[in-house]
Amino acid sequence: WSSDVCSSDLAVIRFFRAFDYFDKIKTFGDVPWYEKDLTTADIDELYKARDDRDFVLGKIIEDLEFAIEWLPEKSAAEVGALHKDAARTFLARVCLHYGTYKKYHNVSTSPTSQELLQKAATLAKEVMDSGLYDIVQGSDAGANQSAFADYPLYYANQFTQEDLTTNKECILARVFEADVLTHNLARGGGVGLSKDFAESFLCKDGLPIANSSEYKGDETLDDEMANRDPRMYQIIDSKYRPYTVKSNGMRVVNSGIDDKKEFSPSEEPGTNIHSAPGLTGTATGYSPIKLVSASQSQQDAVKTSSYDWFVFRYAEILLIYAEAKCELGECTQAVLDETINKLRDRVEMKHLTVSPVADLNPVDYGYSITPLLYEIRRERRVELMAEGSRYHDLMRWACGIRLNQPKLGIIPDKATSENDLNGYNTKDYESIKSGLGFVDGAIDVYTKRMTNPVPNFIDPKNYLFSIPTNQIGLNPNLKQNPGWD
């Protein structure tokens, strides 16, 4: 083998080592760093104390910079294989995470918050300037579904495309194939989104619900979703989300929606039709559908679905760049127009400006931030929903206290008939009424289902997990994290 081939293979190994260690330092803080194979004879290494998190972070950056240098360009990489832009994207994510972590946790060690944020912005801009990627309006055909005329699915369609390998928004895809590698996302998992999340969607006029005259209230799900950011009906199940059912070649809407019947060429439903949300199918009444496939074959496959996933998505690069530039005090209208507003253009939302109106009912982060940074954080929460970033965002922003908020759902007692999208909500409400608690009429998910219904996030203890006691038993040099003794 040539030295270039060996270096390319080593780049893959070092990328995955960085990937693994990034998860470790987010979870535990200081961890032992190893860069060679160990044997039972390596007593000092096996029983050493934890290495400082900044030292390990430096090694992660070194690994990813090596990967950027030696991995192939995307055009030369095999389908689904690592390439330079994947490494750039991951390093930008790492740098944004610890750049903001250090800022909001008041950590002044090297590399500094400013240095990391600048590096995140530089890496993101390199990907943006490559010209290889764009924000895509998802294909109805590629997702096996068809939208109502006034309710396009340009956002949601991106997440159930059968093939992402040529999709311009996809920096790196996890490629699935029937009978080879499959997953089980097609039907969702019966989980529920929070009312807090539902309230985070802006109205179509670009204003928060507390500021906007377009907001119709939450007495019914119809009212709550009216005049909102179109990503809301593409993330939270409702009558505006049509499904293509492959049985008999028919396209059939959510069952029980009389005012949308014209969409169906037949009054006879197909098999396994997806219904609009009922109270027993989700913990909160807000049922997530972002990754749920409309394809009959994918629905029938259950645990053997084969549509591709995004590993790294171009939208994240734009959000990294916007947030890093804002944190650096360098976020101009030009920055917003090439980042946040590209995401909004996809769903035909009003543009964000550098001087947005402050939310009259803002999320309490425990400290003050500018209205611009607040809106960039909101955009990230909405755009990257269910892509694995929210918990870590709260940790790096030093606002873990948000986890202590009550987990509320819809208001079923105000919406039994109006909200009865599938003919089940009325009886569902009666059957679950005795098993649920309520706050201001909204479902309180944990009130009667847990001994300690409200999570107890303790600052600063819970920003790190405990070191497993069995590991400390094996190696007494592994000291426990603060507050966990």
Residue ranges and their predicted role:
Residues 2-189, 207-485:
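Acidic/polar-rich alpha-helix caps and helix-coil junctions
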Residues 186-204:
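C-terminal/domain-terminus segments
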